[in-house]
A protein has these predicted regions:
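Membrane-water interface segments at transmembrane-helix boundaries in multipass membrane proteins
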Residues: 77, 133-195
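Hydrophobic alpha-helical transmembrane segments of membrane transport/permease proteins
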Residues: 16-64, 159-177
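An internal, D/E-rich "acidic patch" concept
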Residues: 54-114
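Hydrophobic alpha-helical membrane-insertion segments
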Residues: 17-22, 137-150, 242-247
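Hydrophobic alpha-helical segments of integral membrane proteins
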Residues: 9, 44, 48, 58-70, ...
C-alpha cells in the first residue's frame, strides 16, 4: 500500500504539472488583457508583467512562474477583475461560501441516498424498487442547472418561500443565510442522492443474494439483522470510498450552480476569470480544480485497502 500510495502521489504531481504547464503556455500565447495608461494600477500591472517575463520566451516565463509559486507561493496579481490584488488572497476569501454550500449538500444527500438505496434493494422487483430505480435514472440524466431553474421557478417565484439568490455577506451560520443557501443546496443534492441510491441498491442487491447471507439466515438471524450486521458491512467497501470522495470534492463546488444562485465562491470566480479574462486567476483556479480531482481519486483508491484489509492496491498477485 505504501509503495502504491507513493506511486499514485508522484503520478498525481506529474499530471498536475503537465496540466498547469499546458494551460500556462496556451494562455501566454494569447495577448495579455490591455490596461489603460489612465488606470491607477497601470504601473503596478506593467511592473508585474515585466517581472514575470511577459516579453521573454514561453519556457522562461513558465520557469519564472514556477519559481514564484514554489519559493514565495506567489500566484500573481489580478490584472482584470480585481486589479492589483493578490489572486491567492482573493481565492481564499471565496472559499468559505463554496465549502459551506457543498457541505450542507453532502450532509443532506448522503443519508437520503443510502436509505433510498437500502429500501429499493429490500423491495427488489416490486413497484417500489422500479419507481425508485426509474426516478434515479431520470435524476442522474438531467443536468443540475435544470433543477436550479425549476427550484427557482417553484420555490422562489411561484411559492415565494425561498430567495432567488444567496444572501450577501459572511454571516454563514445565521438562519437568513441558510435559507438563502437552500435553493443551491437542493440543486446540488439531487444528483448526489441519485448516485448514492443507485450505488447502494446495486451493491446491496448483490450482497443479499450471496451464499453467506443464506447461511446467516439459517443460523437464526432475521432478515433485518442479517442485512444490518452483514450485508451493509460488505456494501460499505464500495459506498464509503464514494463518501470520502464527495467530502474531498466539497471545495470544488459547482461552476454553474454558483453562477445561477450568485454564490460568491471559487466556482463563480473561475467563470468570471474566464470571461474577463483574468489569466493569473484562471491559472490558480485551474490548478486548484485539477488538484482536487486528483486528490479525490487517490483517496478513493487508497481507502479501499483501509476499509477492507483483503484488498491490496497495486499488488500483482
Amino acid at each position: 500500500m505504501i509503495k502504491y500510495t507513493i506511486q499514485r502521489v508522484l503520478f498525481m504531481l506529474l499530471t498536475l504539472f503537465v496540466i498547469i504547464g499546458m494551460c500556462f503556455i496556451l494562455i501566454r500565447l494569447l495577448p495579455p488583457p490591455p490596461v489603460s495608461p489612465d488606470d491607477i494600477h497601470y504601473e503596478i500591472i506593467e511592473a508585474r508583467r515585466e517581472a514575470m517575463g511577459y516579453n521573454k520566451p514561453l519556457l522562461v516565463q513558465f520557469g519564472l512562474f514556477l519559481k514564484a509559486v514554489f519559493t514565495e507561493w506567489d500566484w500573481g496579481i489580478s490584472d482584470k477583475l480585481y486589479v492589483g490584488q493578490d489572486v491567492f488572497d482573493l481565492f481564499i476569501g471565496k472559499m468559505p461560501a463554496t465549502v459551506i454550500v457543498n457541505l450542507y449538500s453532502i450532509l443532506f444527500s448522503i443519508p437520503i441516498g443510502i436509505l433510498l438505496g437500502i429500501f429499493a434493494a429490500l423491495k427488489k422487483n416490486t413497484w417500489i424498487d422500479y419507481a425508485i430505480s426509474t426516478l434515479t435514472m431520470v435524476v442522474i440524466s438531467v443536468p443540475s442547472f435544470v433543477y436550479a431553474f425549476l427550484i427557482q421557478y417553484v420555490f422562489s417565484f411561484k411559492l415565494g418561500w425561498l430567495p432567488f439568490v444567496m444572501k450577501a455577506g459572511t454571516d454563514y451560520f445565521t438562519w437568513e443565510m441558510f435559507k438563502s443557501m437552500l435553493p443551491a443546496v437542493m440543486a446540488l443534492s439531487f444528483g448526489v442522492i441519485a448516485g448514492f441510491t443507485r450505488t447502494t441498491r446495486a451493491e446491496l442487491t448483490e450482497v443479499l443474494t450471496s451464499e453467506f447471507m443464506l447461511l446467516a439466515r439459517t443460523k437464526g438471524l432475521t432478515r433485518t439483522q442479517a442485512t444490518v450486521r452483514h450485508a451493509l458491512k460488505n456494501c460499505m467497501v464500495v459506498i464509503l470510498p464514494s463518501i470520502f470522495g464527495q467530502f474531498v470534492g466539497i471545495m470544488s463546488g459547482s461552476l454553474i450552480i454558483e453562477k445561477i444562485f450568485s454564490i460568491p465562491g471559487v466556482g463563480q470566480l473561475y467563470i468570471n476569470s474566464i470571461n474577463a479574462p483574468d489569466y493569473p486567476l484562471f491559472i490558480l483556479n485551474t490548478a486548484f480544480y485539477t488538484a482536487i480531482s486528483l486528490v479525490a481519486a487517490i483517496i478513493v483508491d487508497i481507502s479501499y485497502g483501509f476499509i477492507d484489509p483483503r484488498i491490496r492496491m497495486g499488488s500483482k498477485k
